[in-house]
Amino acid sequence: MTERSTGLVSVVMPTYNSAEFIEESIQSVQAQTYRYWELILVDDCSTDDTELIVARIADLDHRIRYHRLAVNSGAAIARTKAMELAAGQYIAFLDSDDLWRPDKLARQLEFLQRTGARIVCTAYDHIDEAGTPIGRRVHKPKKHADYNDVLLSCPIGNSSVLFDAGTLGIFVVPNIRKRNDDALWLQMLKKEKYILGMSDVLMSYRVRANSISANKWSLVRYHWTLYRDIEHLSVPRSAFHIFVWGALKTLRIK
């Protein structure tokens, strides 16, 4: 296992054409009250000004590292590459359009130390493209999410997760275009029984009109790929999980 810097949090941020939002996301990392972090951005061959924006910020903050993939490969490959480059004892995920509260890392690290957990996520709210809160909706995770919980409803916000890479190592994100975050949590839960959830709202998830996850019903075939090709579930069990997932979407539970 790679030797890791004790106490360092490696923030993993895959990005693609995020020029409109990425500076605000980076600023939410720079605003953290916990100061011992590095930010690793892996660019999946952006064609907008993402690289220029990151370079300008990184020139003034050497905790920020930028890596550009040779070919456009998808978010899963970019996230895995960022984890490979990470040097920290802890790894936290942040998408390049989401935002953290200033005390996010500090409170998660305190929670890990107090509970002995190795993977933790938090509650989060929703903002629109302008950064305005959407209604009063807050997504709160389960206190203890296990493998079956993630299969049924994935009660985990990607940009809220922090885990102990010093003991768990890093993970290869399954290479599917959508729902690769769900697939990653399932990989983690084969090494750790639970992902623990904090009820504190420490992250804002940005809802974008052109997001590949905005149309929930278009995700059905990706869920099928996840269940059958990656997790190797039986046809009846896969169909059951898709039915439950669809019912939850219809009822607006998630």
Task: Label every model-predicted segment.
Residues I91:
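Short aromatic/hydrophobic "clamp" motif used to bind/position activated sugar donors
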Residues L69-A86, R107:
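Glycine-rich, basic loop-to-helix element that forms the pyrophosphate-binding segment
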Residues G7-S10, E38, A183:
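Cell-envelope/extracellular polymer assembly enzymes that use nucleotide-activated donors
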